[in-house]
Regions:
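ACP-dependent fatty acid/polyketide chain-elongation machinery
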Residues: 1-67, 244-256, 351-365, 409-413
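Acyl-CoA/ACP chain-elongation machinery
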Residues: 39, 182-206, 210-227, 260-274, ...
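Phosphate/pyrophosphate-binding loops at sites that engage ATP/ADP/AMP, CoA/4′-phosphopantetheine
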Residues: 85-97, 245-250, 283-299, 321-325
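Glycine-/small-residue-rich "gating" segment that lines the acyl/pantetheine channel
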Residues: 124-131, 169-172, 176, 192-248, ...
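Condensing-enzyme catalytic core mediating Claisen C-C bond formation in acyl metabolism
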Residues: 5-9, 32-36, 214-290, 299, ...
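Conserved small-residue
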Residues: 10, 28, 82, 103, ...
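Conserved beta-ketoacyl condensing-enzyme motif
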Residues: 8, 21, 29-162, 191-200, ...
Length: 413
């Protein structure tokens, strides 16, 4: 089978750092922290008071009010990000092309806030008062469905629900789908809006969340004092395109998509294998998929959640794949800025990795203060770097043992 080349020609994002890719990337370059007090509900009776919320998002600024009302917040984020990606790519669907264009967008939890509100309504007023729009607005796949409706893309439309790896699985699956000839264009990514009492309570009970009260010491990947992740929200959508298709229409190109690997730990519901072997295999598969050597990789956007098990295990995985080169490459976690956006995380980090290659700038791991001997690689502490990057790897590791890695290459015409 012919392996076609795939490039990234459009980017869209709604994140705790900004409502566009440009604003988000500027914040990343500045090392700005998007974490703050929870405002979407009163967290007085919660142990966790901080989250990485999207600020200033008014859906009616982007969507007709009747449409916006029939979408969950996670779907609104995704549709807005998709619109930005389409505009950024200057892509207009040509007649007869609909079946060669598809959508893959992940969400880990979907419309949880809608479920909470409709449950309360039903319990208080009777279950026949539950909204007929509850199910179609809350289900995880509706973000992908609404993007297809808004764009007219009639090829494959799907929603990987693989927890924190979902965004990476979505973009990786889309890459393979184009590479192997099943589509020419794919909108792909992830979205999440789970800053709710139930989600915060559930993750807190698992001891997964940081209970820090200082936003600058809450999400601290690879730091010896890390104590859990900070829940984030938002979306990112990438427009992937077969290279010749992009060239024919004179599209600008951010980066080339060259590798994808996915594995499963098959070990535990929430904990990764301590040796990081599942994540290591995903990285190795992505590198082999691209046909390069580990020493060719300059930068890794780590999963880096700020939990003890993840960061130590991911460090071990990187060492096992890269050997001595692990100490020569840069590995940073932008979750130090965005928090952990669950099903959107891998997609946002794919956008950041594409911008890293395009702009020649490696993001920092901000708020890093106390080195951990278990995480002794170059984590780009506190200050990003201007550097020409040729290959960037982005990792995601999710509950259920899901591991995913994507490999992007600097575009050289």
């Amino acid at each position: 089978m012919e392996r076609r080349r795939v490039v990234i020609t459009g980017l869209g994002a709604v994140t705790p750092l900004g409502l566009t890719v440009a604003d988000t990337w500027q914040a990343v370059r500045q090392g700005r922290c998007g974490i703050g007090p929870i405002t979407q509900f009163d967290p007085a009776d919660q142990k966790v008071k901080l989250a990485a919320e999207v600020k200033g998002f008014v859906p009616e600024n982007y969507l007709p009010k009747p449409e916006a009302k029939r979408m969950g917040r996670f779907t609104q984020f995704a549709v807005v990000a998709a619109k930005e990606a389409m505009a950024d790519a200057a892509f207009t669907l040509a007649e007869g092309e609909e079946d060669r264009c598809g959508v893959i967008v992940s969400s880990g939890i979907g419309g949880l806030s809608i479920t909470e509100a409709e449950h309360d309504k039903g319990a208080e007023k009777g279950w026949d008062r539950v909204s007929p729009f509850y199910i179609p607005t809350a289900i995880c796949n509706m973000a992908a469905g609404q993007i297809a409706i808004h764009t007219g893309f009639r090829g494959m439309c799907s929603c990987p629900v693989t927890a924190c790896t979902g965004g990476t699985n979505a973009v990786g699956d889309a890459f393979h789908y184009i590479r192997d000839g099943y589509a020419d264009v794919m909108l792909c990514g992830g979205t999440e809006s789970a800053v709710t009492p139930l989600a915060i309570g559930g993750f807190t009970s698992m001891k997964a969340l940081s209970q820090a009260t200082d936003p600058n010491r809450a999400s601290i990947p690879f730091d010896a004092e890390r104590s859990g992740f900070v829940l984030g929200e938002g979306a990112a959508i990438l427009l992937l395109e077969e290279l010749e298709h992009a060239k024919r229409r004179g599209a600008k190109i951010y980066a080339e998509f060259v590798g994808y690997g996915a594995t499963c730990d098959a070990y535990h519901m929430t904990a990764p294998r301590a040796d990081g072997s599942g994540g290591a295999k995903a990285m190795a598969i992505a590198i082999a998929d691209a046909g390069i050597q580990p020493a060719d990789v300059d930068y890794i956007n780590a999963h880096g959640t700020s939990t003890h098990l993840n960061d130590a295990g991911e460090t071990a995985a990187v060492k096992s794949v890269f050997g001595p080169h692990a100490y020569e490459l840069a590995i940073s976690s932008t979750k130090s800025m965005t928090g952990h956006m669950l099903g959107a995380a891998g997609a946002v980090e794919a956008v950041i990795s594409a911008m890293t290659l395009h702009d020649g700038f490696i993001p920092a791991t901000i708020n890093y203060a106390v080195p951990d001997p278990e995480c002794d690689l170059d984590v780009v502490p506190n200050t990003g770097r201007e550097k020409d990057v040729h290959y960037a790897l982005s990792n995601s590791l999710g509950f259920g043992g899901h591991n995913g890695s994507i490999l992007l290459k600097k575009w050289e015409a």
